[in-house]
């Protein structure tokens, strides 16, 4: 009788271990999501750096916060916290000569990707760097973060 319970316990333990262990498909999914996030961030940066952007100097006056050390997916919480101010600055910069296409859609995509990548962890508190960043430095910082994480996955 105990033998059957022991075998059942072992079988359940093995099932739990195999289901919770990261698989190559989950790594591939994470990599794809990071690549999409990277492309969205680069698209925003390219739109801002567009030489026809008459509001660039105004956009550079707004300051953003970067984490002291972003090395894990949970640090995407810090990006999520800055998305609303980022969207507001991008909306202020819209003009008839300069228009970031689909800004709201890009920010929405970034938000969805960040939520999926960082998981449901909400107890993480960001430690921000003491120095603030311009919008260009902010986007470059997160682009570098994505590239760094992608390189560890490949």
Curated annotation (Swiss-Prot):
Residues 1-20 form the signal peptide. Glycans are attached at residue 23. Its main location: secreted. GO terms for biological process: adaptive immune response. Disulfide bonds join 78-126. GO terms for cellular component: extracellular space. SMART domains: IL2 (SM00189). Keywords: Adaptive immunity, Cytokine, Disulfide bond, Glycoprotein, Growth factor, Immunity, Secreted, Signal. It is found in: Secreted. The keyword Signal applies. GO terms for molecular function: cytokine activity; growth factor activity; interleukin-2 receptor binding. The keyword Signal applies. Belongs to the IL-2 family. Cytokine produced by activated CD4-positive helper T-cells and to a lesser extend activated CD8-positive T-cells and natural killer (NK) cells that plays pivotal roles in the immune response and tolerance. Binds to a receptor complex composed of either the high-affinity trimeric IL-2R (IL2RA/CD25, IL2RB/CD122 and IL2RG/CD132) or the low-affinity dimeric IL-2R (IL2RB and IL2RG). Interaction with the receptor leads to oligomerization and conformation changes in the IL-2R subunits resulting in downstream signaling starting with phosphorylation of JAK1 and JAK3. This is Interleukin-2.
């Amino acid at each position: 009788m105990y033998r059957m319970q022991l075998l059942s316990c072992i079988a359940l333990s093995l099932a739990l271990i195999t289901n919770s262990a990261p698989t190559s498909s989950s790594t591939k999914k994470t990599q794809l999501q990071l690549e999409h996030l990277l492309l969205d961030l680069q698209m925003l940066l390219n739109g801002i750096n567009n030489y026809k952007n008459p509001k660039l100097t105004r956009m550079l006056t707004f300051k953003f916060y970067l984490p002291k050390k972003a090395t894990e997916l949970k640090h995407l919480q810090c990006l999520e916290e800055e998305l609303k101010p980022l969207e507001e600055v991008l909306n202020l910069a819209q003009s008839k000569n300069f228009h970031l296409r689909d800004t709201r859609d890009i920010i929405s995509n970034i938000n969805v990707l960040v939520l999926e990548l960082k998981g449901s962890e909400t107890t993480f508190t960001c430690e921000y760097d003491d120095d603030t960043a311009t919008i260009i430095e902010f986007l470059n910082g997160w682009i570098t973060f994505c590239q760094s994480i992608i390189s560890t996955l490949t």
